């Protein structure tokens, strides 16, 4: 209840017909999320953990540097690798216990390759009509915000004591189960 009330308070100035919650943090609590929002439409985006984890660890290190001079990147990285591994394991178990179609599994690579088409597929999957106006707005938004227009987030897995191979080995079951391609 408090989650819903918080969202309602946040949107008070601009009411909307639905919310879009974008966070891997929801992987830890899918049962509670669906209990609170039984009509939720879940999109689980799958991406190579060897790309996700160094980025996540780098962002968390940048935030922590604001508060400490004793930053330990390997410790931060291992914390997040453990946390994401538990989240994926928990979410995959939940996924295996649900009926097919309870969520839409989206490959990040497919989304990046053609975002408008991926969104149209998602809408169709959930039987939500996409109006021509909506499609035009999506197209306009995408053309005004090309990927990497504001720069590229640079990071190196080695900064956190990893190699791409070590992360791919650690998350191989996830990548096999959901056909998550290894990114170059």
For the regions a language model picked out, list residue spans one by one.
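Short, flexible loop/turn elements at secondary-structure junctions
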Residues: 23-27, 49, 110
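Flexible, glycine/threonine-enriched loop-and-boundary segments that flank and lead into catalytic domains
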Residues: 6, 11-39
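PAPS-dependent sulfotransferases, especially Golgi type II membrane carbohydrate sulfotransferases
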Residues: 1-14, 18-19, 53-105, 109-184
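Conserved phosphate-donor/acceptor-positioning beta-strand/loop module used by diverse small-molecule
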Residues: 22, 33-58
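Active-site-proximal structural scaffolding
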Residues: 23-26, 35-38, 45, 84-87, ...
């Amino acid at each position: 209840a408090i989650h819903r009330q918080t969202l309602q308070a946040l949107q008070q100035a601009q009411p909307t017909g639905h919310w879009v919650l974008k966070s891997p943090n929801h992987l830890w609590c899918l049962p509670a999320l669906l209990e609170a929002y039984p009509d939720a439409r879940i999109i689980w985006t799958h991406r190579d953990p060897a790309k996700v984890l160094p980025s996540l660890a780098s962002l968390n290190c940048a935030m922590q540097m604001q508060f400490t001079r004793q930053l330990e990147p390997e410790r931060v990285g291992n914390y997040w690798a453990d946390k994401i591994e538990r989240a994926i394991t928990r979410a995959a178990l939940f996924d295996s216990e649900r009926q097919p179609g309870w969520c839409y599994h989206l490959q990040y690579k497919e989304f990046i390759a053609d975002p408008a088409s991926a969104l149209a597929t998602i809408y169709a999957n959930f039987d939500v009509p996409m109006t021509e106006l909506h499609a035009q707005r999506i197209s306009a938004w995408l053309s005004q915000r090309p990927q990497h227009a504001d720069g590229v987030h640079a990071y190196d897995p080695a900064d956190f004591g990893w190699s791409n191979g070590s992360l791919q080995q650690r998350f191989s079951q996830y990548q096999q189960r959901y056909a998550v391609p290894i990114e170059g």
